Amino acid sequence: NQFDILLCSNLFGDIISDECAVITGSIGMLPSASFNEKNFGLYEPAGGSAPDIAGKNIANPIAQILSLSMLVRYGMKLKKIADKIDKSVASALKAGYRTADISNNNSYLKTNEMGDVISDFLINGK
């Protein structure tokens, strides 16, 4: 809760992202951004490609959605929209919606269902 941004080289970023995954409960919760000197950014989830779960509809979409929020906030300078995206993710989690990687029971959503829930919070402000 103390830090919003960690600045480090790629090697240490890989190590730190693995450590942060333990803190958050899943690598699927970690957005990331890489910038160059001209402020051009690459926004993507902190984890790898996870080929073992590709096409199974079980990946946690939150890191991707929060990476989009970072793109909107830092790349497009649209803070209010980024805040709405962040709030939608937080609202979905607060309401108890979870994907399998962060669920502590047998009730969880698939990737597309979690995306739909977060979209619903974003569009309808639920």
Swiss-Prot record:
One Gene Ontology MF term: 3-isopropylmalate dehydrogenase activity
Binding site for Mg(2+): 14, 18
Pathway(s) the chain acts in: Amino-acid biosynthesis; L-leucine biosynthesis; L-leucine from 3-methyl-2-oxobutanoate: step 3/4
Record's keyword terms, sorted: Amino-acid biosynthesis, Branched-chain amino acid biosynthesis, Cytoplasm, Leucine biosynthesis, Magnesium, Manganese, Metal-binding, NAD, Oxidoreductase
Binding site for NAD(+): 48-60
Enzyme class, spelled out: oxidoreductase
Subcellular location: Cytoplasm
Cofactor dependency: Mg(2+); Mn(2+)
This protein's GO CC annotations: cytosol
Matching PROSITE patterns: IDH_IMDH (PS00470)
UniProt cofactor note: Binds 1 Mg(2+) or Mn(2+) ion per subunit.
Gene Ontology biological process terms, A to Z: L-leucine biosynthetic process
InterPro entries registered for this protein in UniProt: IsoCit/isopropylmalate_DH_CS, IsoPropMal-DH-like_dom, Isopropylmalate_DH
EC number: 1.1.1.85
Subunit structure: Homodimer.
Family: Belongs to the isocitrate and isopropylmalate dehydrogenases family. LeuB type 1 subfamily.
PANTHER family in UniProt: 3-ISOPROPYLMALATE DEHYDROGENASE
Name of the protein in its database record: 3-isopropylmalate dehydrogenase
Species this protein is from: Buchnera aphidicola subsp. Uroleucon rurale
